[in-house]
């Protein structure tokens, strides 16, 4: 079913289910010794989508559930999440080393960095997402007996609404630099909402703030690859619709847009990240799915 501008979800439906899928990929990468996210598998189990639970537990074989030779699937996603998780973990470590003590995770989903990363003393982590998502994650992690490694402030608001006011009310200090993460987010926003998000991040950011974002091109080829993978997964028990979750239409290139706002962006193509981690590359043939995907880090310098 096509998205609407004010749709909502939990972690077993719509966009929320993609957060569970991503956590399943992190759990699989953790089982393979590629990353260390001990919270991913129990969070996926608690959501209760059987296909993702079996994925997280290592009970599914990629050779059985993936389309042979396809650009997307369980194994491809596990590889990508390995590279992505390492990249963003390193981003936060570098931001902390630079003295940044405010962290904002946009559309945090089942991200558990507030519990698994060694944050410097004085750091506060702000997590922004839909109320049902944040409530579920907090309750599940509390049942595990885990404590955050830095104070966590939940900001329960839709990013298409007035989240800047909610963030400030939660104690965010616009006079101090922040480290922002937009992981797996921008492609799920309407084009104009993507621009508003980056405008708001800029308005809230003091000089020296840093941002990391995943840029996922919503091309016809990438959509076809995602839909083909989803269809194969449904034949193996997936009962959640994962197609048509993005918003079609032309949109501004995030790195170029950020540069116009005073940020100094650096692009890292997806294949470079995969190569840096010794993982199989995606095709770069013209029109190939995901060939345009990249990761962007940026530092704000409003003074120019």
From Swiss-Prot:
InterPro entries: Ppm1/Ppm2/Tcmp (IPR007213), SAM-dependent_MTases_sf (IPR029063), SAM_mthyl_Trfase_ML2640-like (IPR011610). GO terms for molecular function: methyltransferase activity. S-adenosyl-L-methionine binds at residues 129, 158-159. One of its GO terms (biological process) is methylation. The keyword Transferase applies. This is Putative S-adenosyl-L-methionine-dependent methyltransferase MAP_3385. Gene3D superfamilies: Vaccinia Virus protein VP39. It comes from Mycolicibacterium paratuberculosis (strain ATCC BAA-968 / K-10). Keywords: Methyltransferase, S-adenosyl-L-methionine, Transferase. Exhibits S-adenosyl-L-methionine-dependent methyltransferase activity. Signal peptide: none annotated. Coiled coil: none annotated.
